[in-house]
Amino acid sequence: METRQLGGLWPVSALTLGGGGIGQLWGETTREECVATVQKAVDLGITLLDMAPSYGNGEAESVVGAAFKGNLPANVRVTTKHRLGETNPKKIEQNIRSGLAESLKRLRLERVDLFFLHSNIIPHDFDASVYVTRPATRWAVYKEPVSYTHLTLPTKA
């Protein structure tokens, strides 16, 4: 499998297994089919699994957890996401912590490689997005359940 550099982070397979299909976003499949799909993808050289709690209401993350039972192959990277939506700025850090904890539990992992805050974080409040949300993600990197974080921020007009 051809590899490519993921930004300044690591080399990963040119193909990524996204969680939409195994989260049953496009139609019903069995858990067994989804687990087999993830395992086969990794066997064939896919090294990046892109998950999110919104892919099947946590099902995609649960499938990865079932596929590897906490024993992810060393060369496989996992990303997941969290959506803050209109969270009160005073509750952002707790919202991120609890969302990440739930994802890790479903994935049966102690850490993920890349954690995205998925969406415009607080579209009407740019300052909260930049000055509250970014610092609230730093604990995850320092405490090591996440290797890297990435924010999708609204642009300030």
Where are these regions (language model features)?
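N-terminal binding-site loop/beta-alpha segment at the start of enzyme catalytic domains
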Residues: 1-76, 110
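Active-site beta-loop-alpha junctions enriched in small/polar residues
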Residues: 20, 52-54, 81-85, 117-120
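Active-site mouth loops of central-metabolism enzymes
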Residues: 21-31, 82-94
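Short, acidic/polar
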Residues: 29-40, 92-105
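Generic structural signal for well-ordered alpha-helices
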Residues: 38, 61, 65, 100-101, ...
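Active-site cleft segment of glycoside hydrolase catalytic domains centered on the general acid/base Glu
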Residues: 90-93, 122-145
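Active-site groove signature of glycoside hydrolases
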Residues: 107-127
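Conserved small/polar residues in nucleotide/adenosyl-binding loops
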Residues: 149-155
